[in-house]
Regions:
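Pyridoxal 5′-phosphate
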Residues: 1-185
Length: 185
């Protein structure tokens, strides 16, 4: 597929992957790879963008300010070298420190250990949910991430989510940022 891309720029949103698997952008063959830090247990408002140097040098910044400018005249603006070209204004220093700490934390735990623990919890949840009447676990025997989807007969998903929350069980209901898919299902 890489050979047939021509001028297409491939951006991968890796927010869901970074806390669960090692990511090799060279192996993926993407042009840009982004993730938000809160998916890696960092504070909100921080993330990372990796990009191929030649692409980052060509792309214009989307914001203006501070360190990103090398020269400004009435006739032209010359942007700073990367990465400063994309660093408009005062950086989110606290967020960057938090992201670095989160990366150290996850690295210290080890992605394999995290995956094994998630799998153990997922298996326990699936077995417990399968035993509940009027509850259907979708694809219970298919290997998957720690996300477990269920259908509850006769109960609206928001009501079920509220009841579980009152019992101290964290769940997510709604469209999960993919409303077209949910509508199709």
């Amino acid at each position: 597929a890489k050979e047939n891309r021509q001028e297409t720029i491939v951006l991968i949103d890796g927010a869901q992957a970074v806390s669960h698997m090692n990511v090799d952008v060279q192996e993926l063959g993407c042009d840009l790879y982004a993730f938000s830090g809160h998916k890696l247990y960092a504070p909100t408002g921080i993330g990372a963008l990796w990009g191929k140097r030649e692409l980052l040098e060509k792309l214009p910044p989307w914001m203006g300010g501070g360190e990103m400018i090398k020269e400004v005249t009435f006739e032209k603006t010359v942007y700073n070298d990367i990465p400063f070209k994309y660093e408009a204004g005062t950086p989110n220093i606290g967020g960057a420190v938090g992201l670095a700490a989160a990366i150290r934390y996850v690295s210290g735990l080890g992605l394999d250990n995290i995956a094994a623990h998630e799998q153990k919890l997922t298996d326990m949840a699936v077995e417990g949910l399968k035993a509940m009447p009027r509850l259907t676990v979708l694809a219970p025997d298919v290997p998957h991430s720690a996300v477990v989807s269920v259908l509850a007969e006769g109960v609206h998903h928001y009501d079920l989510g509220t009841l579980l929350d009152q019992m101290g069980i964290a769940v997510r209901t709604g469209h999960h940022c993919c409303q077209p898919l949910m509508c199709a299902l």
